[in-house]
Amino acid sequence: LGSASVHVKLIKAAQEMGIYTITTDNVPYEDSPGKKIADEYWNLNIYDVKEIVKKAKKEHIDGVICGWLDPCQRPYFQICHELGLPCYGDEKQFFKMTDKHAFKKMCEENNVDIIDEFTEADIKGNKVEFPVFVKPVDSRGSRGQAVCYTMKELLSAIEVAKEESSNGDVLIEKYIKGSQEFHVTYFFVDGEPYLLRTSDNYCGSEEMHMEKVVSCAVMPSRYTSQYIEKAHPNVVKMFKNLGIKNGPIFMQGFEDNGVFRFFDPGLRFPGVDYELVFKKVFNVDLMKAMIQIALTGKTDVVIPKDAAFIKGGRASVLYLTIRACTISHLDGE
């Protein structure tokens, strides 16, 4: 489900397993890397659950999977549910890992630290401490997000964020500046969590208006040992309480003077290709594990317990935030 570049590795994995692979979304073929390599493609919007289910029944589809694309998460569950096919999450799990208010409440219930939030009552009572960060409750990427330094900017940003939110709900949080952005990814196998990845993420410059856009991630995070000691136990407890059995889960947050504060979740992998690095280092194919889950509901993948430390090595992922152009050269070792 979804034909973007982050799903190319998933399509290739299925094909290597000898599985006839179909991909669908409403993106034109020429702009869709997944459609160019799939055995077959449909031009059905990922939100058109009714038509996808209808066609899937007609074609006798054996499994459905996504795993890397944020907007596919809830439709993925709905499609699997209607078809009676395995799905690595249920309705409650996908809701709590896509709705930021529900996620923050779950964190509070499990003693996982979050970012301080302001309410409409705080606005009316003039109790907002600027600067603040405004965002839709469930939009993807940086859509509808804004940093606000005045009440005028805040009121304007709220209206923009509401337009990008599926239900008109928005979040108003304390703007964290100067702290290290920190990501964490887990993979569950038969109810047991494995810490796959920690990363320190670096955003672009304010001068180029790229301060909200990640340009580079370095793995493992320099705070990994500290995270495992201070936050990991409660995070694992939270996910087990949520009932996660198999599949990926990740969170974005900040390291804030020894406190790990999380703000954005996903019942999926982050939208990068780190799993290819993981495969190269450990000879463990997480994409094929996802295909197993799609077909059987389980996976026999074996993940090293200290995987997040990458055997003592380092890795980085660069995010090319550039306009359409021709790259003249690349340097490096």
Regions found by a protein language model. Give the residues of each.
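ATP-dependent carboxylate/phosphate-activation module, predominantly the ATP-grasp catalytic core
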Residues: K174-I244, P248, E255, G266-A294, ...
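Active-site nucleotide/adenylate-binding loops and adjacent lid/helix of ATP-dependent enzymes
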Residues: K96-L171, I176-G178, V189-G191, S221-P233, ...
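Short acidic/polar active-site loop segments enriched in Thr and Asp
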Residues: D62, G168, K240
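Protein kinase-like catalytic core scaffold
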Residues: V132, Y194, R261-D264
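Peripheral (often C-terminal) accessory segments that flank ATP-dependent C-N-forming ligase machineries
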Residues: I291-E333
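Short, conserved charged micro-motifs
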Residues: K50-E51, L154-S156, A324-D331
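ATP-binding N-terminal substructure of ATP-dependent carboxylate-amine bond-forming enzymes
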Residues: L1-Q93, G297-V301, K305
